[in-house]
């Protein structure tokens, strides 16, 4: 996050002394103040991108309405119009996500009146851009806040979370253990770690460390690349390697998602699958690293998220979303809403530690 929007995204943004409308109005005023100080397009872009990394769907709608009177050529109008048009569902719900900064690198999104026992907790490990491959409200817009809480983690040191998270701890194990003092994983129906790109391997590690139900790693780096990154910063990869090699029971379900036409990501997925029991889901027709962005561009983000999460995004009862098929784009170039069962690209592999 840039310093320019620190006040907008500071911990404790959802304080109990003000209403959601008052907090959104305060955020809007802070946004206007920040962009008024920008003198270059790069400065504007930095502010807008940083805000996109934090705001909720309700805040996007509020900003969109408030900025509708701006001149069409104004940067603020163009930015919020693009952001609002990109919302996958754009549904006004009975309860809405509110955000609360737990510390510098941790933001909690929750509809507070809802019971955690009815919800799935998603712990998101963002990549180096501090987002899950796209603006945060686009991801949140796919989820029913009555059924999901989301905790987004950000690695400002850009060392695969190995130096911890400010305010939680100075290493991965300490930071993740301290997270439980803010968010009670055991209070939820189930808990899933969800990491993209540089956050992929940490998501797998977190699921093992915290005994989560599932880990989803989208376009993760292969472990050798993570180890090399740590080495360049004088950090040891021993704790990460040991955790990947451990087999606590019950062991979390691990799903690795990658673009079928991206050679490096395919190789990284295969390499990780040799280290940890996992399934690999290859997204056909996708040649880019940013798999979630590709699904969004094809209008398939909500059903794709339901598929990889293995449950409905809208209903309490789990949906039937067995990963026995690839997610494809038809030969016409348009998205196919149904998987092609006869052409599976889901590859389970036995635990490598049990191989003969």
What are these regions (language model features)?
Residues 151-171:
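Cap/lid segment of the alpha/beta-hydrolase catalytic domain
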Residues 1-121:
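Flexible, membrane-associating and regulatory peripheral segments of lipid-active enzymes
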Residues 217-227:
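Active-site nucleophile loop of the alpha/beta-hydrolase fold
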Residues 185-197:
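Alpha/beta-hydrolase fold nucleophile elbow
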Residues 228-295, 307-320:
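The feature captures the conserved acid-bearing segment of alpha/beta-hydrolase catalytic domains
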Residues 195-207:
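Glycine-rich nucleophile elbow surrounding the catalytic serine of serine-hydrolase chemistry
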Residues 91-148, 155-159:
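Short, surface-exposed "cap/lid" segments of acyl-processing enzymes
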Residues 166-185:
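Alpha/beta-hydrolase active-site loop
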